């Protein structure tokens, strides 16, 4: 299961550390906005005027307000994916 978190955790952590605003779309279509205060395996703590604990299983999409750059720790994964895109 840790392999499934190899992209999710660095992505959410970058959004949290850089205090990037996000729109979080839930599976029922509701849009939440704010900044990621914290997260763990099951929930994201989203801060706007109040803090909301959002369960990850209810999330469809996380959209940052600006492009972000992830740490290049997964550089070899990107190299493996490159030939498939050609």
UniProtKB/Swiss-Prot annotation:
Purpose of the protein: RNA chaperone that binds small regulatory RNA (sRNAs) and mRNAs to facilitate mRNA translational regulation in response to envelope stress, environmental stress and changes in metabolite concentrations. Also binds with high specificity to tRNAs.
GO molecular function term, any single one: RNA binding
Chain ranges of the Sm domain: 9-68
Gene Ontology cellular component terms for the protein in this record: cytosol
PANTHER family referenced in this protein's UniProt entry, alphabetically: RNA-BINDING PROTEIN HFQ
Pfam families documented for this protein: Hfq (PF17209)
Protein's name according to its UniProt entry: RNA-binding protein Hfq
Subunit annotation: Homohexamer.
Keywords of the record: RNA-binding, Stress response
A GO biological-process term: regulation of translation, ncRNA-mediated
InterPro entries given in the database record: Hfq, LSM_dom_sf, Sm
Family: Belongs to the Hfq family.
The keyword RNA-binding is annotated on this UniProt entry: yes
Organism: Pseudomonas fluorescens (strain SBW25)
């Amino acid at each position: 299961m840790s392999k499934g978190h190899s992209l999710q955790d660095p992505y959410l952590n970058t959004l949290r550390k850089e205090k990037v605003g996000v729109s979080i779309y839930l599976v029922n279509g509701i849009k939440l906005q704010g900044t990621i205060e914290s997260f763990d395996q099951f929930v994201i703590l989203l801060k706007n005027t109040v803090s909301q604990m959002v369960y990850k299983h209810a999330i469809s999409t996380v959209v940052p307000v600006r492009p972000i750059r992830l740490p290049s720790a997964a550089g070899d994964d990107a190299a493996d994916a490159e030939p498939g895109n050609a």
